[in-house]
């Protein structure tokens, strides 16, 4: 779905582990790394798209994660001119993205990048929370900075958050 301004509706996915690290994946056959993301199909909600992309790109199911937060607004980035396909109609000049912060509830071994015949990624690793902002391709950097800043209050190491909940439960 491309809007009247030429932006394709898309979701981005930040997956955190209990240590507050984030899932960072290498694009298949390339040297670039990014968060999972994908386009919204006609009739899909952003949440439905997120779960579909999570399964297609990372091999995880809804029960493998917990939604912690979603971005308040759609965040946009423009594609560099060299990446715009002028022969398609309508012409897509960039992405507008709704972002989701997920907590991983399964084992690392459950991640399967080869769920589809055309995998998006060929490797992945856990990285520190702010690492992607400096490492993503330059045209996505502002969106990554904005979404990571928005999610930061929710993304402190989850094990510490759960310890705090237990601490306050025991004080009552």
From Swiss-Prot:
Cofactors per UniProt?
a divalent metal cation
| Its EC number(s) | 3.6.1.-
State the Gene Ontology terms under molecular function: mRNA 5'-diphosphatase activity
The segment(s) forming the Nudix hydrolase domain are 6-149
Query: Which cellular component appears as one GO term in the record?
Result: cytoplasm
Q: Which InterPro entries match?
A: Nudix_hydrolase, NUDIX_hydrolase-like_dom_sf, NUDIX_hydrolase_CS, NUDIX_hydrolase_dom, RppH
Q: Which UniProt keywords apply?
A: Hydrolase
Q: Which family does it belong to?
A: Belongs to the Nudix hydrolase family. RppH subfamily.
Function, in words: Accelerates the degradation of transcripts by removing pyrophosphate from the 5'-end of triphosphorylated RNA, leading to a more labile monophosphorylated state that can stimulate subsequent ribonuclease cleavage.
Return the protein name: RNA pyrophosphohydrolase
Q: Which organism is it from?
A: Pseudoalteromonas translucida (strain TAC 125)
């Amino acid at each position: 779905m491309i809007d009247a301004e030429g932006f394709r509706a898309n979701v981005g996915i930040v997956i955190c582990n209990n240590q507050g690290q984030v899932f960072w994946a290498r694009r298949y056959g390339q040297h670039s790394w990014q968060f999972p993301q994908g386009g919204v199909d006609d009739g899909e909600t952003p949440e439905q798209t997120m779960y579909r992309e999570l399964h297609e790109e990372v091999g995880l199911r809804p029960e493998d994660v917990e939604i912690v937060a979603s971005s308040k607004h759609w965040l946009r980035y423009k594609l560099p001119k060299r990446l715009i396909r002028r022969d398609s109609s309508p012409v897509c000049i960039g992405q507008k993205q709704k972002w989701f912060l997920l907590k991983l509830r399964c084992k690392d071994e459950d991640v399967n990048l080869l769920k589809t015949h055309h995998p998006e990624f060929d490797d992945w690793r856990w990285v520190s929370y702010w690492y992607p902002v400096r490492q993503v391709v330059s045209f996505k950097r502002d969106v990554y900075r904005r979404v990571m800043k928005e999610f930061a209050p929710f993304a402190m190491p989850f094990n510490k958050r759960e310890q705090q909940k237990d601490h306050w439960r025991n004080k009552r």
